[in-house]
UniProtKB/Swiss-Prot annotation:
Its EC number is 2.4.1.17. Residues 24-494 are extracellular. It catalyses: glucuronate acceptor + UDP-alpha-D-glucuronate = acceptor beta-D-glucuronoside + UDP + H(+). Residues 516-530 are cytoplasmic. It comes from Cavia porcellus. The gene is UGT2A3. This is UDP-glucuronosyltransferase 2A3. UDP-glucuronosyltransferases catalyze phase II biotransformation reactions in which lipophilic substrates are conjugated with glucuronic acid to increase water solubility and enhance excretion. They are of major importance in the conjugation and subsequent elimination of potentially toxic xenobiotics and endogenous compounds. It is a single-pass type I membrane protein. GO terms for molecular function: glucuronosyltransferase activity. One of its GO terms (cellular component) is membrane. CDD domains: GT1_Gtf-like.
């Protein structure tokens, strides 16, 4: 860097520090895919506020390009697997989720999924081992004296790094399978009577049989995660720290939990003072479209356009499925912008244009956009909420069915089954969302709720990270439930004591009554004899 530019950068940093009153050092343990998009947005805001950000990233990561983010420092951790192997694992999972598992019986697909996640856990353990047992790296991190560590607990290890460095940390996530991390590590209440378990596709208004399903899912996830995930990490963390401990004991030390959802998206539920809901922090006003794309959008006239994307992970569909979708799109008067990298469908209509990539947020914010066809990823749904665009959902896996179930319940979306839908089903869903004004009205209502917050989600998230840096933690927000055993948490010891007291009182009264009755009989017999 030239001396003049370096001096300007230093001056800018000093001005930022003077404005905020504090310049901190932030260490980051990220997750990939859409998780990184949200975290990156927060980190960019922290850099704007004058903080120094260092991201720990693996040499085989697919989504974090450490050569394209000059605002961050990167510590690249060498691991034995390369990017090709990581990409193969990801593609294998997508193939299973999109094309294989939907054709299997539930028990068979569940068993296959279990085997896959057991392997993933072992791979993550290897990555963590390459991090915390890398003595030169850990020494460098200790010497850097970081003020806070921001981690995504979906990928364990960040909290272990924080524990070994003696640094307070902040968790950032949307959900964990079965809410197990939030419930058992964060002590967040999640009554299954009205809080839907993630991956169940349920809403907060459940019938009796849906509550049965929710309870079964809750118990199954608790058992599965404890048996196949937490057990592994409990042993790993104990070995790394040289003392008996558990994943939840370490993860539960998080000062603040930043949850990537909000009440425009989430159903009402209990939460704790150290849980902050920051959903939609990545959303922003639309920017002008590229010239060619803008011309295509304007050519739609009063009919407007439909935006179609299945996210960054699903790049291709089977030829049959692609033709089915293209056939439905060809029958609507709107122009369609479809993000798709596969072979051009034979049934593609003249109103539909394929793109390798689209500026999704900018398109959703365009005044001519009438509907959004989505797989139900939370980032895309939040952009639709932000701009007030109704949706047609085609969920594939993970939390996508849950997200779309919520949007359906709020009247802002129609859902079609990706595996069983016909061209007529998709066409009918599109016509409903576009022609029925209630869907647009409900989407705009959610948009108004999202925008009507006293503090923007991004500012709120950045504030709490800075708060932890300023105060060396947030222990005053930590509930005492972390210090209780499971039987104390559920007051089983108190209930047992009270039952013992009641039983003792009943026994005492019974004994007194029997004693009195026996004395009364003896007195009666004595009187008769006299």
């Amino acid at each position: 860097m030239a001396p003049g530019k370096l001096a300007s950068a230093v001056l800018l940093l000093l001005l930022c520090c003077a404005g905020s009153g504090f310049c901190g050092k932030v260490l980051v343990w990220p997750c990939e895919m859409s998780h990184w998009l949200n975290l990156k947005t927060l980190l960019e805001e922290l850099v704007k506020r004058g903080h120094e950000v260092t991201v720990l990233t693996l040499s085989n990561n697919l989504f974090i390009d450490y050569n394209r983010h000059p605002a961050f420092n990167f510590e690249v951790i060498p691991v034995p697997t390369d990017k090709n192997m990581s990409e193969n694992i990801l593609n294998e999972f997508i193939e299973l989720a999109v094309n294989v598992m939907p054709t299997m019986p539930l028990w068979q697909s569940g068993k296959l999924l279990q085997q896959f996640f057991v392997q993933i856990t072992e791979d993550l353990g290897l990555n963590c081992r390459n991090t915390v047992y890398n003595q030169s790296l850990m020494k460098k991190l200790r010497d850097s004296k970081y003020d806070v560590l921001v981690t995504d607990p979906v990928i364990p290890c960040g909290e272990l790094v924080a524990e070994m460095l003696g640094v307070p940390f902040v968790n950032m996530l949307k959900f964990s399978m079965g809410h197990t991390i939030e419930k058992y590590c964060g002590q967040l209440p999640a009554p299954p009577s009205y809080v839907p378990v993630p991956l169940g596709g349920l809403t907060t208004r459940m019938t009796f049989m849906e509550r049965v399903k929710n309870m079964v899912f809750s118990v199954l996830f608790d058992f599965w995660i404890q048996q196949y995930d937490y057990k592994f990490w409990d042993q790993f963390y104990s070995e790394a720290l040289g003392r008996p401990t558990t994943l939840c004991e370490i993860m539960g030390k998080a000062e603040i939990w930043l949850i990537r959802t909000y009440w425009d998206f989430e159903f009402p539920r209990p939460y704790l003072p150290n849980f902050e809901f920051v959903g939609g922090l990545h959303c922003k006003p639309a920017k002008p479209l590229p010239k060619e794309m803008e011309e295509f959008v304007q050519s739609s006239g009063e009919d407007g356009v439909v935006v179609f994307s299945l996210g960054s992970m699903v790049k291709n569909l089977t030829e049959e499925k692609a033709n089915l979708i293209a056939s439905a799109l060809a029958q609507i008067p709107q122009k369609v912008l479809w993000r798709y990298k596969g072979k051009k469908p034979a049934t593609l209509g003249p109103n539909t244009r394929l793109f390798d990539w689209i500026p999704q947020n900018d398109l959703l914010g365009h005044p001519k956009t009438k509907a959004f066809i989505t797989h139900g990823g939370s980032n895309g749904i939040y952009e639709a909420i932000y701009h007030g665009v109704p949706m047609v959902g085609m969920p594939i896996f993970s939390d996508q069915p849950d997200n779309l179930a919520g949007m359906k319940a709020k009247g802002a979306a129609v859902e079609v089954n990706m595996n069983t839908m016909t061209s007529a089903d998709l066409l009918g869903a599109l016509r409903t969302v576009i022609n029925d004004p209630t869907y647009k009205e409900n989407a705009m209502k959610l948009s108004r709720i999202h925008h009507d917050q006293p503090v923007k989600p991004l500012d709120r998230a950045a504030f709490w990270v800075e708060f932890v840096m300023h105060h060396k933690g947030a222990k005053h927000l930590r509930v005492a439930a972390h210090d209780l055993s499971w039987f104390q948490y559920h007051s089983l010891d108190v209930i047992g004591f009270l039952l013992a007291c009641v039983a003792s009182a009943i026994l005492l009264v019974t004994k007194c009554c029997l004693f009195s009755f026996q004395n009364f009989i003896k007195i009666g017999k004595r009187i008769k004899k006299e």
